[in-house]
């Protein structure tokens, strides 16, 4: 549905988790924003724990919708007949070539989804900016997956570069933490908080994601690692 969960006694494996049309309309036309778009520098406003949770939930809702729109577009690209005939049972195989008019309908469908994703990402960036509150681990991961999906759909390198840029930002953000952790003697390292230990495990994950989203470009990934090691003096 739009933003709420519906409890219904029916399950269907083809049913999407998000009603993309309704939710897109709700977010772009019906949401009332709280003024965070006026924030121009970090620390300008104080956000308490409750507000931060709400902000994160709203970002997550936008990213969930963007991802679902991306999945719809991707599925239309790999199975264009689904746009024309709907989701057919696996036992039914469509072998007919699409007409020019049908292909145009598929292209329009994919383009519509891509434009909606772009609108959502711009809206999130404007109304819930990172300068007001840093992205969480999960939000960075969601954003990277969305940009990678856009790259898969369109083949446009700008989306891949944006994805890799986000990962580089995160790696630099936590590079100084890794430098500090490696400097600790064993007793102090063993006393690190769960949050610190999460960063320790998160860092290698970011590197793996960079390698994956770069198209498994080993040279590009190795160059990044050398740059990080030189900058933050960790191994």
Region spans (language model):
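ER/secretory pathway lumenal C-terminal domains and tails of membrane proteins involved
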Residues: 1-235
């Amino acid at each position: 549905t739009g933003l709420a969960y519906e409890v219904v006694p029916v399950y269907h494996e083809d049913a999407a988790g998000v009603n993309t049309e309704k939710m897109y309309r709700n977010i772009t036309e019906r949401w009332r924003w709280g003024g965070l778009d006026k924030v121009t520098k970090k620390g300008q406003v104080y956000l308490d724990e409750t507000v931060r949770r709400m902000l994160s939930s709203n970002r997550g809702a936008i990213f969930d919708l963007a991802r679902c729109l991306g999945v719809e577009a991707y599925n239309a690209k790999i199975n264009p007949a689904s746009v024309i005939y709907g989701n057919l049972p696996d036992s039914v195989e469509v072998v007919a070539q699409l007409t020019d008019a049908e292909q145009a309908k598929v292209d329009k469908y994919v383009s519509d989804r891509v434009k909606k994703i772009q609108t959502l990402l711009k809206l999130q960036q404007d109304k819930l900016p990172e300068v007001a509150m840093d992205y969480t681990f999960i939000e960075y991961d969601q954003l990277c997956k969305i940009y990678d999906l856009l790259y898969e759909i369109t083949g446009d390198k700008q989306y891949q570069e944006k994805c890799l840029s986000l990962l580089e930002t995160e790696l630099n953000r936590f590079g100084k933490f890794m430098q500090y952790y490696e400097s600790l003697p064993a007793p102090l390292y063993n006393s690190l908080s769960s949050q610190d230990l999460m960063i320790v495990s998160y860092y290698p994950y970011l590197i793996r994601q960079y390698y994956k989203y770069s198209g498994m470009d080993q040279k590009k990934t190795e160059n990044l690692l050398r740059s990080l090691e030189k900058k933050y003096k960790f191994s």
